[in-house]
């Protein structure tokens, strides 16, 4: 698979190891005829040691086939997150490093996740596109605030902060996009 086709969360073989791509930066050439380069921030799977590498857009990487199991968040055990397989009730434990920044989107009862397995051991987590989280703290709506469409910060039950419209109040449940971290609307 070409480096330009890789996405965040992809698992690749590189330099005699298996790595998950956590961040991708694209750099465009400054002059004529330059090649587009991709800089990947990767973490070893399992283990979590960080590696940064740059690739040309046409450079080939070997994608590793993952087994994906649908699971729901069960509980937190210290720094580890435990997920329950929806089909056979197997428990999968992922440490905080494997979860990474996604920890802010994981709340009690979260379902629709996919635990990614290599050789039957859990290595990564794929969240649903949107999650429902409760607003625990946000400033009150200003009078006339709906006319200006000013966003305001809102602290969510998991500890992360997102920008929300003025009309959102403390205690409301909202949709949050897990890819961008942006407000996605009120939860029904």
From Swiss-Prot:
One CC-aspect GO term: cytoplasm
Any single GO BP term: peptide biosynthetic process
Protein source organism: Xylella fastidiosa (strain Temecula1 / ATCC 700964)
Stored PROSITE patterns: EFP
Classification via Pfam families: EFP, EFP_N, Elong-fact-P_C
UniProt name for this protein: Elongation factor P-like protein
GO MF annotations, alphabetized: translation elongation factor activity
Top-level lineage group: Bacteria
PANTHER family, alphabetized: ELONGATION FACTOR P, TRANSLATION ELONGATION FACTOR KOW-LIKE DOMAIN-CONTAINING PROTEIN
Family from the record: Belongs to the elongation factor P family.
CDD domains: S1_EF-P_repeat_2
SMART domains named in the record: EFP (SM01185), Elong-fact-P_C (SM00841)
Matching InterPro entries: Elong-fact-P_C, NA-bd_OB-fold, Rib_uL2_dom2, Transl_elong_fac_P/YeiP, Transl_elong_KOW-like, Transl_elong_p-like_YeiP, Transl_elong_P/YeiP_cen, Transl_elong_P/YeiP_CS
């Amino acid at each position: 698979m070409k480096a330009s086709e890789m996405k965040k969360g992809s698992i690749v073989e590189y330099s005699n190891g298996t790595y998950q791509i956590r961040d991708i930066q694209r750099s465009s050439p400054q002059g004529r005829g330059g090649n587009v380069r991709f800089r990947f921030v990767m973490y070893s799977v399992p283990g979590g040691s960080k590696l940064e590498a740059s690739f040309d857009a046409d450079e080939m990487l070997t994608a590793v086939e993952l087994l994906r199991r649908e699971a729901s968040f069960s509980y937190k055990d210290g720094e580890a997150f435990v997920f329950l397989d929806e089909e056979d009730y197997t428990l999968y434990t992922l440490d905080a490093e494997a979860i990474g920044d996604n920890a802010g989107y994981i709340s009690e009862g979260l379902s629709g996740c996919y635990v990614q397995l290599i050789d039957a051991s859990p290595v990564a987590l794929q969240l649903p596109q949107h999650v429902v989280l409760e607003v625990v703290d946000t400033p009150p709506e200003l009078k006339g605030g709906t006319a200006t469409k000013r966003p305001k910060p809102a602290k969510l039950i998991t500890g992360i902060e997102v920008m929300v419209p003025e009309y959102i109040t403390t205690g409301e449940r909202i949709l949050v996009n897990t890819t961008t971290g942006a407000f996605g609307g009120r939860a029904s």
